[in-house]
């Protein structure tokens, strides 16, 4: 028997009715012990982690770099972190990358990021 190309197979499928194609798929699954539904299940499972990321409610505000305006960033850090002295804030800024806030809600994290970036820092939310 001559080997058929993909194009020849597709042309043969185009000439078949839906019932004939359905019967072909069932027989193909039986002969090769595969199912046509397996890729759909894998795709659905792959979508689940993306949904989990969208539902994230707690964020860490991470100071990546203080930038050129280190004094302004130190002041911003002292405003954001209660009870932090000047020395501790300076050490925190100079030790970047460091988490400034951990487990903050989205609004607080966004506000802190904006404040630090306004002061000249490079900040990421994780």
UniProtKB/Swiss-Prot annotation:
Keyword match Mitochondrion: no
Sorted UniProt keywords: Ribonucleoprotein, Ribosomal protein
Gene Ontology cellular component terms for the protein in this record: cytosolic large ribosomal subunit
A Pfam family that the UniProt record links to this protein: Ribosomal_L12
GO biological process: translation
GO molecular function: mRNA binding; structural constituent of ribosome
Entry annotated with the keyword Ribonucleoprotein: yes
SUPFAM superfamilies reported in the protein's UniProt record: ClpS-like, Ribosomal protein L7/12, oligomerisation (N-terminal) domain
Entry function: Forms part of the ribosomal stalk which helps the ribosome interact with GTP-bound translation factors. Is thus essential for accurate translation.
Complex and partners: Homodimer. Part of the ribosomal stalk of the 50S ribosomal subunit. Forms a multimeric L10(L12)X complex, where L10 forms an elongated spine to which 2 to 4 L12 dimers bind in a sequential fashion. Binds GTP-bound translation factors.
NCBIfam families xref list: L12 (TIGR00855)
Family under the similarity heading: Belongs to the bacterial ribosomal protein bL12 family.
PANTHER family: 39S RIBOSOMAL PROTEIN L12, LARGE RIBOSOMAL SUBUNIT PROTEIN BL12M
Record protein name field: Large ribosomal subunit protein bL12
The species this protein was found in: Corynebacterium diphtheriae (strain ATCC 700971 / NCTC 13129 / Biotype gravis)
């Amino acid at each position: 028997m001559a080997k058929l190309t993909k194009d020849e197979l597709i042309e043969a499928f185009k000439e078949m009715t839906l019932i004939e194609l359905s019967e072909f798929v069932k027989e193909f699954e039986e002969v090769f012990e595969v199912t046509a539904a397996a890729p759909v299940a894998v795709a659905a499972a792959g979508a689940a982690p993306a949904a989990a990321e969208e539902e994230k409610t707690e964020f860490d505000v991470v100071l990546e770099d203080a930038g050129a305006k280190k004094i302004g960033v130190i002041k911003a850090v002292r405003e954001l972190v209660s009870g932090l002295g000047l020395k501790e804030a300076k050490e925190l800024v100079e030790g970047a990358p460091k988490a400034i806030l951990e487990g903050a809600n989205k609004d607080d994290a966004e506000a802190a990021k904006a404040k630090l970036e306004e002061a000249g820092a490079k900040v990421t939310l994780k």
